Amino acid sequence: MSRYRGPRLKKIRRLGALPGLTRKTPKSGSNLKKKFHSGKKEQYRIRLQEKQKLRFHYGLTERQLLRYVHIAGKAKRSTGQVLLQLLEMRLDNILFRLGMASTIPGARQLVNHRHILVNGRIVDIPSFRCKPRDIITTKDNQRSKRLIQNSIASSDPGKLPKHLTIDTLQYKGLVKKILDRKWVGLKINELLVVEY
């Protein structure tokens, strides 16, 4: 399957708040929710919804998610925790978490249009895996800085996770360490995704 480009509000109505996909949040207690979610939920449906949450939040294709699950399965630690760490260390997600982009699709666009440097080199692959001590900056031109400046001004500095730091004056972010489970920006049961 390809990347989802359709109506975002339909997805957040069905799956709940997905901060990486859109800033909007679903209305609580809507009639649509009662219509769709009547009756007992089956185990398959619960697992599928958790997987879809992960896919739509991080903007992954089905094949990319399967590849990440396969890599996480080879690790000696908890598969679910390794999966979340792999997804959180993607360049597009780190830009979103730093506040340099309002959504993950917006961060993907910044990376694809070559506005972002990692350790002084242009990176145009959104799935680039960042490592601790990586420095993420923008190009020196005014257009790149203006795009980042608008996003940083509208972001909440209190939501910055502990594994990242940002210098808002120089438009520079630093990955300090690999993230802990409690700082993941999405409420999800990753074990259900692995079981699916």
UniProtKB/Swiss-Prot annotation:
Q: What is its main location?
A: plastid
Question: What would you give as a GO molecular function for this chain, any one?
Answer: structural constituent of ribosome
The places in or outside the cell where this protein is found are: Plastid, Chloroplast
What would be one Pfam family of this protein?
Answer: Ribosomal_S4
Which Gene3D superfamilies does this chain map to?
A: Ribosomal Protein S4 Delta 41, Chain A, domain 1, RNA-binding S4 domain
The record's keywords, sorted A to Z, are:
Chloroplast, Plastid, Ribonucleoprotein, Ribosomal protein, RNA-binding, rRNA-binding
One GO biological-process annotation of the entry reads:
ribosomal small subunit biogenesis
Checking CDD domains in the record gives: S4
Query: Is Aminoacyl-tRNA synthetase found in the keyword set?
Result: no
Looking at the keywords, is Cell membrane present? no
Matching InterPro entries: Ribosomal_uS4 (IPR022801), Ribosomal_uS4_bac-type (IPR005709), Ribosomal_uS4_CS (IPR018079), Ribosomal_uS4_N (IPR001912), S4_RNA-bd (IPR002942), S4_RNA-bd_sf (IPR036986)
Q: Where is this region: Disordered?
A: 17-36
Query: What function does the entry list?
Result: One of the primary rRNA binding proteins, it binds directly to 16S rRNA where it nucleates assembly of the body of the 30S subunit.
Q: How does it assemble?
A: Part of the 30S ribosomal subunit. Contacts protein S5. The interaction surface between S4 and S5 is involved in control of translational fidelity.
Family classification? Belongs to the universal ribosomal protein uS4 family.
UniProt-recorded name of the protein: Small ribosomal subunit protein uS4c
